[in-house]
Amino acid sequence: LGNWLILEAIGSYLVGKKIEYIKDKILNFVVLQILFSLSFFISVWLTRSIKLLLKIPFGVSLGVDLIFLITILILFFPSIIHGALFTYSAKILQQDGEKNVVKISKVYIFETLGTIFGGIIFTYILIKFFSIFQIVFIIFLLNILCCIALSFINIKNKKVLGITTLTSFLFFVLIFFNLQNYIEKKTISKFWSGQEVIYYKNSIYNNIVVTKQNQQYNFFVNSYPLFSVPYIDKMFVEEVVHIPLSIIKKPKRVLILGKGAGGIINELLKYENLSIDYIELDKDLLETFKILSVDILKKELNSRNVSLYYLDGCYFLKNIETKYDFVFIGFSEPKDLQINRFFTLEFFKILKSKISDEGVVTFQLPGSYVYLSKQLAELNKCVISTAKNVFKFVNVLPGDYNIILCSNSDITIHLAPEKVISGLKEKNILVDVLNEKYLEYRLNKEKINWFNHQLEDTNVKLNYSFLPSAVFYSINYWTAKLSPKFFKYFNKIQTLKEKTFVFYLLISILILTMIIFLFTKNSTAVSSTYIAISTGCVSMLLNLTLIFSFQVLYGYIYYQIALLSSFFMLGSILGAYLAVKHLRNLKLMGLEIFILLLSVLFFLLLKTIKDFSNNKILYFVFPYIFLILSVLVGSFSGIEFPILNKILIENSASNISSVVGKIYAFDLLGGWLGAILGSIVIFPIFGIKFIFYAIIILKITSLILLSLTSIYERQRI
């Protein structure tokens, strides 16, 4: 998202400076529109071929620095061209020499309106019923229709008519020969080089792929391996199931939160009269398991003892009264906000109230038998310390993956080889891997003591829903592992203190203001440009805060998050519309104060939502408040865009295209800064509270700059 915004800003800015010197603007607009459509083909092809082009072996993860550079490469053409198209549209609507802010604002409104419709149609229709290249072809068709309409308007321009006709002919040739499906299959095959892809689907939550090698089926979700059948990882499934269940005398009810199919449920079915509740958010994922005629999957998912729920795990637990003897959390580490919710203090408290007196909660974290790096120790200690703040007893079985056992009763005495074997024999459970020798190795007291000693001197923050420290530690761990050069700089972020960050933020604002002044040498332009950047940044920070908060409270509910983004865009339209209607009466100083006060109200409402999130009635009301807040936040950028254009046009010798390109570019630049700072630094390290502080600083400095500009302009007169 951040890279899309910065590249679009570059496209808007560069074209804004050059467009006045281009004679045939309609022709260039049509060419750009066609190139924009073609750029999607290039981007999708690059996404699926980039590893082969860079000679990166299949299955090898990429570091943060390489991901950053690759996303710039993939998004380069569509983003740059899209930014350029905005400036072109604004210029084409202007007559020669005309400086009409209303027409510029209409371009902004219609572009945002298109984004809303595009987002809703993509989320609710396209992603469900069409492949990626079919979607690309649909976009191509819509753009060609626009070009045809333009060519009829400018029927005398033979170049426009010729290019449109040729492009239309080539497009329909591609459709006639069904090349979109051919390209789809070829690019998927390239991406999964060396494996036979037998199933490929995009659900509203995940990209689901099944490959086949000899007689083995491999399941992938978002390119990450899920499991393989029929040759399952016996060691893993037997450890995480039978070690905890050997402790429980008569287990009756089990809860699986994700990743239960492909071995876990199969082992649980060995226990008599065991009732299993299996929670999986993505229904399409389980439907995929059922489609493939694999014995172990049919046995697991068709068993009478297994109840399937297509829900968010956190939501499910909040709304049931059942007590469980065993809870298995299938996520291996809190690598993002969606998964992090299952490792927070708040969630552990809910879990504690949902397990029986001798109940056990099990999850796993990355580990090592021989060496724990500082970053790996931080990740483990963060989650384990958080669990220890809730559960009376937390035991760790260290290994290549650490098995964490949480309970309200002391189970340490039962974590001995003879006790585990005795418990399994009493329940008539047959196992393949968990023999006495292996258990002596896995439950070795010296290794457990060594692991605990490694964590003793590690200082970490606890993991909360609204302060997701574990997400940062996870990113830090993988950055150290995959991007050692970039890690040297990234690691310094976590050492930042709040006061230090505020100091750096103020210094950055001062430097930014000086840079703007050097380029513009106009006090009005300086304040207007800074306000465009700060408002773009504030809008993005608030929008991310809403999305993060919604995820924390309600999970990764794709439809609702798409709605949040759409309502944010709707707010931009309403803001721009109101500004156009009252262009003469609105003052920038008043708007900045208004935005500042609304930001304070925003966070007060968000705090209220957080404090009352456990109230069952309000829990169903709050999503509507989120939508209202999204409209409010979106209106910030929308309402200031026409005002800033009006001010700069009146106080600048620059042509109108240059002004429009600059304001749009600086608004997007602010959005880019907000996306990077909010998602990587502020939210995971300091929490939502500090996003509020950052917004207050940005808007107060805007007011100070506006006041100084006003004083300076009066003295000049």
Question: What spans do the regions from the language model cover?
Answer:
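Alpha-helical transmembrane segments of multi-pass membrane proteins
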Residues: 1-413, 418-429, 444-717
